[in-house]
Amino acid sequence: MTLEDLPNELLLLIAAYNDNHGDTLSLAQCCRRFYALLRQEVYTSIDFTYLCPWALSRLTHTVIEHPELAQSVRKLSMGVRNGYCPKSHRPNTKYHAATLLPAVSAAAHTPDEQQAWQKALQCGQIDPWTALLLPLLPNLSQLKLKLDYPASYLNRMLERAVRGQKPFDTTPPFPALEQVSATWHDHENGIFSSRLLPFFSFPAMRRFQGHMVVEDHIAGPAPELLKRREFSGVTDIDLTAAHAEQGLGYLLRACRGLKSFRYVHAHASISLKDFNPTRFHRALEPHRETLERLEFRLDDGFGWGSTGSEREDDFFGPLAGFTALREVALRAANILDWSKGDDGFVGALAENLPRALRVLALDQFDQCDLGAMVAQLEGLVGCAKDRFPDLGTIEIQGDLHDAGRGGRSMKEEVVGVTERLRGLCSAAGIDCRWWNREGGYTYAVS
């Protein structure tokens, strides 16, 4: 018996239980019967390796001509990987006026806008094709975008979605959209954070990822959102290579109950704004009863351990009042107030952490007072049974590797000063892990 002998019902079950979407696509390409049967399954997940008008225009025509395929699309990744559209595809933008005109007419607000939009589509511009396509996918739940500037068509479409304007005047905007990932198209500058607020307003949104987000306070799409509070169901924000001097206040206060926040501050080629940990603590305080995971550190992918900011080693702020917080990952320099005090810092580490703590990770461990920090960790482990009953893991990261000793050996001075801490962790049943972070790579050391 071959695959061609299997009944349609069994083939559909195989496709439904297949975790690798590429395998489903390969199966659909075996013969015309399989393609006709599995076409809707194939369209549930679309991944453009390289985003270009050739691909966008063909997909847009397809979902307009076949509404059942538009209904099938759940995941759409729009060229977030680095690369370029093949040269053979660049001049081949598909534009069939009779097919596109109803969709453009439904989205445009004036005849002049409609005419300009049609011209932009014919010219093969990515932004107008993206803005036209997205509202055509009513069941889209996961979206990955590579954003450019100024992206005026997409910004306009998002603004209309927030305000319930045409084409969203008869149906709710993006009712199934749960996850959005936005990546900047270049290696400099970044995505203005005000451009991202409209995504937070969609009813099903729960998770937002952003790469190279730069905080701004200008009037982006739907500027009225800048002053609104708790209108978003987003629970998870993950920002890498980001720059935010003021603590992303309007993004964080938009959320009703944030559960996870990850912020990795970028090097200076993206922005020269200061790295100010204290302002993030203030912005996160409204979520002290819901926040479960916090990661806040510097991006050292380029081997830079510092931003050059005068505020980068400031105390993040006390976390004891964050009653749901279970995982904390901070720079060692930010977890204590090192600015004053007889011991070189103010307050004890154990006093700054929440009772629900399960995992504590300290980054750039080598850039603080090693003896003082180890003593604080020893005190933390010593009282863990009573104050932190769920604490199971402590992770230490930094420049800890001794290249001269070979293998993955730790520097002798680090081994000496942490020997007692290791013993205390072992006796308390706490897994103490040591990681060397170097040039964007992380590996275990002992």
Located regions from the model:
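Leucine-rich solenoid repeat modules
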Residues: 14, 298-302, 308-446
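Conserved LRR concave beta-strand detector
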Residues: 45, 75-77, 142, 179-181, ...
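Acidic-and-aromatic substrate-binding clefts and catalytic sites of carbohydrate-active enzymes
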Residues: 23, 46-60, 188-190, 216, ...
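Leucine-rich repeat
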Residues: 88-285, 289, 301, 306-309
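A structural motif corresponding to the C-terminal end of an alpha-helix
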Residues: 129-140, 286-290, 321-324, 387-388, ...
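Short amphipathic alpha-helices and their capping/turn segments at secondary-structure boundaries
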Residues: 59-75, 132, 195-196, 247-251, ...
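Soluble or luminal CAZymes and related metallo-dependent hydrolases
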Residues: 6, 26, 51-58, 121-129, ...
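Hydrophobic regular-secondary-structure patch
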Residues: 2-91, 142-165, 182, 303
